[in-house]
């Protein structure tokens, strides 16, 4: 990768929804290399950036992360939030720092 063609945060933000998506993509690429027996390099992160530069994003390896909470956690959350609600009228702007 030539110095002027290096990935910047702006370029990576266009390619991936979040840093976690980039990390997950790199992990999947590393697993594929290990499965193929191609572990010559010690820095898979740099190799993944080179791969992105050369081949672009391979859609079959991108993933959508959906965060879900179990019903038990949601129930506990709702129980705690009801008992901990504070009256916003009790505060003034002078209390906010």
Swiss-Prot record:
Comp. bias intervals (Basic and acidic residues): 73-88
Family listed: Belongs to the chlamydial CPn_0121/CT_031/TC_0300 family.
Q: Can you say what this protein is called? A: Uncharacterized protein CPn_0121/CP_0652/CPj0121/CpB0122
Q: Where is this region: Disordered?
A: 72-97
């Amino acid at each position: 990768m030539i110095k002027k063609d290096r990935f910047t945060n702006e370029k990576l933000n266009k390619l991936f929804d979040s840093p976690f998506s980039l990390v997950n993509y790199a992990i999947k690429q590393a697993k594929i290399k290990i499965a193929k027996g191609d572990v010559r390099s010690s820095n898979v992160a740099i190799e993944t950036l080179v791969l992105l530069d050369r081949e672009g994003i391979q859609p079959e390896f991108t993933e959508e992360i959906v965060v879900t909470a179990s019903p038990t956690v949601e129930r506990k959350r709702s129980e705690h939030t009801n008992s901990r609600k504070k009256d916003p009228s009790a505060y003034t702007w002078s209390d906010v720092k």
